[in-house]
């Protein structure tokens, strides 16, 4: 049993980082005068930044403002206080102002500001042929599609302040993912959409693993997304799993990293057995492998 789990973890590691198994090199920005570091793979649209408070008893709270959103890091949030910041896939390249305020236990305040340079990111384009009912649903299904979209947004809008994850994130399948995050998809040569996740092709029925520990906040069957699972990992981080053939969890379940939550399928707007795996951080659509790259152990 232990050997089987070790092999599975090894395969997932290879899927994430290749046969070499090396985690990509991280970049770090240390904030002068404030015990905080910003860790990230790249400063590009679709990337994830980790803002961590370092060990310093004299600072009780840090406020971070980036891209129009304010984040609070409080020492009371756990043994590893920090926040995840997502750079949405639609973010324009160019300057992005980082403002950091450190509140000390004696009441004094330290302030730091820096202009970060967001590099451009190129996305691919793909033409896809699907059944017309997946582009223009029958009248009886249009209300269902809207209701499901509203439900998904409502679920993603509820943020859990505590961190529920266990160490670093892992891919949900051992198979290698397509490099199609942010892809501009044109269906039947007339309807376009942006692909806000990555696709992983795998045999029908292959077990899908939870990419980290958390609470199942949605497990349902959607018209376009097929059978889906959404896991809340806390602190605004959600993982999404679409087009499954079978769900192995239900809403309200607490799952551990690596647990089987579903099976690969071809449900919804899909052209073959695969898993759509997405990550949302607050309102930002980010590359799942940017989150996997972060060293959270």
Placement of each model-derived feature along the sequence:
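Bacterial N-terminal signal peptides
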Residues: 6-16
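Cationic-aromatic interfacial patches
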Residues: 23-115, 120
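Terminal peptide-recognition signature
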Residues: 68, 98, 177, 200, ...
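Surface-exposed, glycine-biased beta-strand/turn segments
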Residues: 112-225
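Zn2+-dependent peptidoglycan hydrolase active-site motif and core
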Residues: 196, 211-248, 273-278
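Short, well-structured beta-strand-loop connectors
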Residues: 207-217, 249-264
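Conserved, short, structured surface segments that act as functional micro-motifs
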Residues: 229-232, 253-297
């Amino acid at each position: 049993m232990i050997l089987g789990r070790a092999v599975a973890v090894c395969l997932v590691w290879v899927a994430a980082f290749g046969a070499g198994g090396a985690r990509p090199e991280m970049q770090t920005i240390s904030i002068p005068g404030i015990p905080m570091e910003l860790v990230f793979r790249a400063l590009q649209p679709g990337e994830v930044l980790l803002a961590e408070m370092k060990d310093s008893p004299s600072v009780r709270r840090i406020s971070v403002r980036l891209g129009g959103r304010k984040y609070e890091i409080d020492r009371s949030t756990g043994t590893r206080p920090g926040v995840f910041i997502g750079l949405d896939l639609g973010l324009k390249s160019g300057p992005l102002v980082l403002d950091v305020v450190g509140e000390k236990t004696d009441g004094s305040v330290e302030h730091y500001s820096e202009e970060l340079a967001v590099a451009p990111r190129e996305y691919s384009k793909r033409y896809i042929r699907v059944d017309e009912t997946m582009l223009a649903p029958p009248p009886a299904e249009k209300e269902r599609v809207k209701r499901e979209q509203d439900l998904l947004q409502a679920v993603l809008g509820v943020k859990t302040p505590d961190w529920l994850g266990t160490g670093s994130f892992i891919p949900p399948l051992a198979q290698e993912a397509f490099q199609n995050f942010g892809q501009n998809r044109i269906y039947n040569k007339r309807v376009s959409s942006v692909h806000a996740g990555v696709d992983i092709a795998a045999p029908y029925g292959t077990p899908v693993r939870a990419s980290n520990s958390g609470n199942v906040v949605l497990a349902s069957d959607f018209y376009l997304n097929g059978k889906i699972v959404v896991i809340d990992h806390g602190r605004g981080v959600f993982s999404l799993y679409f087009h499954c053939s079978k769900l192995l969890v239900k809403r309200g379940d607490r799952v551990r990293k690596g647990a089987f939550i579903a099976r690969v399928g071809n449900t919804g707007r899909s052209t073959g057995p695969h898993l759509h795996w997405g990550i949302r951080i607050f309102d930002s659509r980010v590359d799942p492998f940017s989150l996997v790259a972060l060293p959270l152990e």
